[in-house]
């Protein structure tokens, strides 16, 4: 049975079972790997691939070899490289029109029972880790029992993977087949898998596959306390549990060249360093339509840069082969004018992000805490800024003024949500601020807090190009008596401030607005406007801060709980729409500009890059373009 949600530019198809096409009898491989086979360093390609590899339909059949040159911002910039190579049990793939479909990745098939309580998956026969070890359900069971349910590593399980309060259960059928079950229906589970069963080792996400043969030596169910203590010391962390997680030096692919992976490339020279390199995985499990083992490209090189001007210079000098990350929309004209000089062309993708101000409802400053929790204050912040000016000056007019809500083309798009509180109205902003008791002003015409101090708010961003945007915003807020203090800080510090509840407002692109059901946590407050409230919710009150009984965020959580146990897609979507509506109506996050046409730099010899796709964290950013089928045309160099 096929269930389809179709609206505009996005199509979500959930297939109960998908037959993997039979690959050609004879497979081809990169000359780089062929040389290793001839030297006796690798087995033949037929022995490295699964019996029936997954087939990736390349835009056109490519050629092997070459280095993909990119740029990165430092050790904290792991997500740029990560999204080039993530793999999921199921993944979103664009069709010829750019609509997305859910298809199997490293599995042979899957099935769902009638009430969506059981999901059965069969791994590809002959699937292998990058070191050649077989991938089996023993790795799945290791992840589930020794990581997911291990309180030392995963003290709390995210609500999106414990609907109704009960974590998912695992049953291993044989060495390739396993079943995940829930106590109640979970119609969104496949959507969530396509977002979160990734090559990035999030401990409480259904990654399903952790290499037991390698990681068990760092796990307390297998290793002695003495050995774990030695490992922690060796890797420079305080506790053995710190070895784990997406930032752990053992389980982070970005940091550990020894970690076996199933992705198209693996880390070769990790950060920090001026150049980070990734090299092809000789055991990657996919081929193109003619039986050529993927990826086409041998290596990916990320060169360090510190300032936006330096990155733009790299582009103009032809040093960037293909990149979307850090390519600034406000510089679109500059990029176009230098196409011939740099030997590239500029494509565009549509961003599902909304650049936004995220007030911290849990901010430690008592005066600001009270204001940020006041709907009228958030309303004033929203209507007190001219988004059209922000769009023109900050994004070259390539976006649109909008709230944080599902993008056009999403199954959950609502035009009324899109324009909620987005019309510039400084008179209304002043009226609202006076109404809530901020009518007193100092000699510079800034409003005074009840304690007599000037109303000052620090807004922090980590992008260089955000500086002029924040200055424009500061001018608008000055007109309504608020002193906005912009700060540009390092990305690592920005993340730490968010994680440690040490910020007032953060300027950031709010994502996951295409298929919201795949990851609603931004709307629920996680890593966003109410991190401490979400921690309280996630841990059943053991951590974080309890929200007031009247707080609308409680309704948002209740709506998700209804959606996550609904018996039908219609019932689930009704609850999800209620959740989104409550979030938008409260104005918890102040959206500014979204649906931006993102410039994509593509060298003229860099092939198979699709144009016009949707960029979102849900679909794993640039990964939606199927990077393993990108190739470099040596004849055009």
Each language-model region and where it sits:
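Gram-negative bacterial Sec-dependent N-terminal signal peptides
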Residues: 1-24
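Short, well-ordered beta-strand elements
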Residues: 63-74, 108, 118-121, 140-143, ...
């Amino acid at each position: 049975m096929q269930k389809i949600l179709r609206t505009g530019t996005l199509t979500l198809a959930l297939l109960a079972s998908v037959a993997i096409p039979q690959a050609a009898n004879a497979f081809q491989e990169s000359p780089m790997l062929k040389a290793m086979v001839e030297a006796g360093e690798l087995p033949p390609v037929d022995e490295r691939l699964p019996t029936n590899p997954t087939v990736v339909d390349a835009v056109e059949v490519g050629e092997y070899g070459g280095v993909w040159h990119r740029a990165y911002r430092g050790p904290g910039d792991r997500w740029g490289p990560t999204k080039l190579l993530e793999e999921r049990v199921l993944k979103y793939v664009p069709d010829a029109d750019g609509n997305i479909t859910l298809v199997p990745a490293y599995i042979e098939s899957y099935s769902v029972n009638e009430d969506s309580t059981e999901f059965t998956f069969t791994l590809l026969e002959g699937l292998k880790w990058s070191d050649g070890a077989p991938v089996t359900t023993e790795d799945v069971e290791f992840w589930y029992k020794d990581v997911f349910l291990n309180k030392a590593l995963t003290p709390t399980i995210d609500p999106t993977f414990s609907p109704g309060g009960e974590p998912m259960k695992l049953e291993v059928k044989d060495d390739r087949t396993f079943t995940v079950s829930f106590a109640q229906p979970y119609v969104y589970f496949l959507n969530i898998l396509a977002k979160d069963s990734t090559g990035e080792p999030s401990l409480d996400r259904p990654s399903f596959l952790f290499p037991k043969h390698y990681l068990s030596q760092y796990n307390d169910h297998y290793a002695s306390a003495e050995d774990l203590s030695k490992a922690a010391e060796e890797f420079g962390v305080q506790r053995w549990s710190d070895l784990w997680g997406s930032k752990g030096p053992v389980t982070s692919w970005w940091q550990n060249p020894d970690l076996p992976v199933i992705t198209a490339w693996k880390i070769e020279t990790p950060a920090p360093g001026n150049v980070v390199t990734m090299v092809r995985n000789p055991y990657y499990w996919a081929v193109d339509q003619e039986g050529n083992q993927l990826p086409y490209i041998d290596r990916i090189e990320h060169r360090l840069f510190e300032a936006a001007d330096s990155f733009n210079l790299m582009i103009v000098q032809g040093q960037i082969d293909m990149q979307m990350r850090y390519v600034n929309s406000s510089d679109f004209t500059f990029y176009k004018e230098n196409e011939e000089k740099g030997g590239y062309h500029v494509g565009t993708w549509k961003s599902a992000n909304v650049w936004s101000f995220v007030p911290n409802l849990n901010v430690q400053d008592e005066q600001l805490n009270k204001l940020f929790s006041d709907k009228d204050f958030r309303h004033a912040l929203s209507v007190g800024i001219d988004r059209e000016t922000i769009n023109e000056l900050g994004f070259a007019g390539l976006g649109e003024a909008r709230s944080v809500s599902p993008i056009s083309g999403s199954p959950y798009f609502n035009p009324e949500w899109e324009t909620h509180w987005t019309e510039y109205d400084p008179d209304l902003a002043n009226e609202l601020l006076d109404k809530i008791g901020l009518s007193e002003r100092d000699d510079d015409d800034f409003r005074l807090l009840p304690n007599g101090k000037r109303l000052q708010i620090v807004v922090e961003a980590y992008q260089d190009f955000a500086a002029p945007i924040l200055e424009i915003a500061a001018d608008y807020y000055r007109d309504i008596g608020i002193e906005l203090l912009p700060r540009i800080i390092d990305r690592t510090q920005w993340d730490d401030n968010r994680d440690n509840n040490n910020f007032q407002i953060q300027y950031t692109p709010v994502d996951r607005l295409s298929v919201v059901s795949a990851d609603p946590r931004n709307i629920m407050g996680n890593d966003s406007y109410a991190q401490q409230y979400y921690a309280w919710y996630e841990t059943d009150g053991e951590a974080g801060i309890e929200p007031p009984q009247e707080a609308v965020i409680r309704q948002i959580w209740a709506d998700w709980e209804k959606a996550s146990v609904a018996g039908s897609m219609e019932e689930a979507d009704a609850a999800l729409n209620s959740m989104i509506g409550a979030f938008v109506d409260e104005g918890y996050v102040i959206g500014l500009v979204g649906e931006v046409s993102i410039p994509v730099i593509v060298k003229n010899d860099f092939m198979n890059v699709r144009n016009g796709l949707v960029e979102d964290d849900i679909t794993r950013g640039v990964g939606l373009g199927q990077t393993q089928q990108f190739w470099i045309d040596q004849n055009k160099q």
